[in-house]
């Protein structure tokens, strides 16, 4: 059984026991969160209607809070000697899917 959930502006296909890295969700490691909205559930039959999906919940446990890979940014303007180098690491949360009900 799997579900498609939306969090942090992205959609993820999850099944029970999966580890998923998503955009930062507030909470301490070990705490549980509910992932909403659920967009689709596939068990014995596929459910995609809003009335059916209101009854479905996907629960997850926060495994760790961390940072994603570093992205290097280089700004450059020719003929002026202007150079600027920046870096960015997006905060991410690792979740373990504990149940789809």
Swiss-Prot record:
GO terms for cellular component: cytoplasm; ribonucleoprotein complex; ribosome. The lineage of its organism: Bacteria, Bacillati, Actinomycetota, Actinomycetes, Mycobacteriales. Disulfide bonds: none annotated. GO terms for biological process: translation. The keyword RNA-binding applies. It comes from Corynebacterium aurimucosum (strain ATCC 700975 / DSM 44827 / CIP 107346 / CN-1) (Corynebacterium nigricans). Keywords: Ribonucleoprotein, Ribosomal protein, RNA-binding, rRNA-binding. InterPro entries: bL21-like, bL21-like_sf, Ribosomal_bL21, Ribosomal_bL21_CS. This protein binds to 23S rRNA in the presence of protein L20. Part of the 50S ribosomal subunit. Contacts protein L20. SUPFAM superfamilies: L21p-like (SSF141091). Signal peptide: none annotated. NCBIfam families: L21. This is Large ribosomal subunit protein bL21.
């Amino acid at each position: 059984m799997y579900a498609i959930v939306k969090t942090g502006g992205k959609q993820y296909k999850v099944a029970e026991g999966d580890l998923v890295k998503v955009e930062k969700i507030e909470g301490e490691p070990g705490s549980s969160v509910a992932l909403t909205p659920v967009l689709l559930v596939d068990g014995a039959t596929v459910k995609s209607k809003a009335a059916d999906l209101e009854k479905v919940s996907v629960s997850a446990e926060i495994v760790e809070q961390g940072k994603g890979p570093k992205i290097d940014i280089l700004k450059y303007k020719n003929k002026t000697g202007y150079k600027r180098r920046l870096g960015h690491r997006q905060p991410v949360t690792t979740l373990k899917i504990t149940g789809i009900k």
